[in-house]
């Protein structure tokens, strides 16, 4: 629990008379003191009376109790002082920590449930096995799964810096990859109930306030879908381009078009390095020579041709991949055929950027 955590929690409190602006954006957080398992926050109110003062104090206390570890003492004080000048964008970010990153690649999907995070994790491990320096930012703020898939749940994230203005997250290193997830920061199993502006701020912190160091690839596991969070992320992070993950199923393929259009939007204009078809066929462990096309056949390849984007490959639906994700041991670590599929995918991506 640190100052950055508390600032994030206080972003959950909006001033009803100030639209969607929260306490942090309004410059109302005057001081934060953390000592001996207790939190004391001081809010600054203007000289003119604010009829919502008691409400905001109570809402701030509730946000702190809701998010802080059990048993934490919480106190919210107030002072009469004109709040600091509000920032139009809330917490300010810069690109300094990305200066030594060669390629930033967003891993996207038009819808959830297509295995985007599984592909991200195994693609990262495969790139590392090919000798590249790799990092992964899990920006899926609503369902971060990378801590589970990498066996890094419960890891304590270290911080660099003397105060909240220059604190940096230190990513977890495992399997030759640097990992940082919203799930690492928020804690295992903690519900993330954030509105759009708060979600955008959280994922930007994960990407822009992390000491990544020199990297050949930084993969960003983006939230599924296409919306304001995605546009905000793409606008603020200098992505080299994107990879879109789908299944051969018609329902998933219909969402690929929306994802492609998002990156091709005139306000975005990011290259699409290719499309990955996940769950292309099912092969029973006892019958490795058999293929069952449960979701249709070659739909991803056809969609890639229709959109005139590279087709990076097909990943089967097999027990080893699922078990590796559940156990935190990515299948790309192995030289079996399914692991080899991710190595081939990594080689094609490296050639495409």
Model-derived features with residue positions:
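Phosphate-binding/switch loop-helix module in NTP-utilizing enzymes
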Residues: 183-233, 253
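C-terminal lobe/tail of nucleotide-utilizing enzymes
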Residues: 3, 26, 45, 58-62, ...
């Amino acid at each position: 629990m640190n100052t950055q955590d508390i600032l994030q929690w206080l972003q959950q409190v909006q001033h009803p008379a100030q639209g969607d602006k929260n306490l942090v954006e309004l410059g109302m957080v005057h001081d934060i003191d953390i000592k001996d398992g207790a939190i004391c926050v001081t809010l600054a109110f203007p000289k003119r009376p604010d009829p919502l003062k008691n409400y905001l104090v109570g809402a701030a206390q509730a946000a702190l109790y809701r998010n802080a570890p059990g048993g934490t003492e919480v106190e919210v004080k107030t002072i009469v002082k004109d709040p600091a000048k509000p920032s139009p964008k809330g917490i300010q970010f810069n690109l300094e920590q990305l200066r030594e990153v060669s390629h930033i690649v967003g891993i996207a999907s038009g819808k959830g449930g297509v295995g985007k995070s599984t592909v991200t994790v195994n693609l990262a491990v495969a790139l590392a096995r090919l000798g590249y320096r790799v990092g992964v930012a899990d920006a899926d703020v609503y369902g971060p799964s990378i801590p589970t898939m990498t066996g890094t749940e419960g890891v304590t994230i270290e911080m660099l810096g003397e105060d909240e203005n220059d604190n940096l997250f230190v990513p977890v290193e495992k399997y030759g990859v640097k990992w940082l997830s919203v799930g690492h920061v928020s804690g295992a199993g903690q519900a993330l109930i954030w509105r759009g502006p708060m979600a955008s701020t959280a994922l930007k912190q994960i990407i822009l306030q992390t000491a990544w160091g020199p990297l050949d690839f930084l993969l960003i596991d983006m939230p599924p879908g296409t919306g304001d969070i995605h546009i905000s992320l793409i606008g603020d992070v200098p992505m080299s381009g994107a990879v879109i993950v789908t299944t051969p199923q018609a329902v998933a393929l219909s969402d690929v078009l929306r994802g492609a259009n998002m990156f091709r939007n005139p306000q975005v204009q990011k290259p699409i390095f290719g499309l990955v078809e996940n769950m292309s066929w099912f092969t029973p462990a006892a019958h490795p020579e058999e293929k069952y096309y449960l979701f249709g056949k070659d739909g991803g390849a056809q969609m890639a041709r229709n959109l005139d984007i590279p087709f990076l490959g097909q990943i089967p639906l097999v027990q080893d991949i699922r078990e590796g994700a559940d156990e935190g041991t990515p299948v790309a670590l192995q030289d079996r055929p399914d692991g080899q599929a991710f190595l081939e995918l990594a080689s094609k991506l490296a050639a495409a950027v």
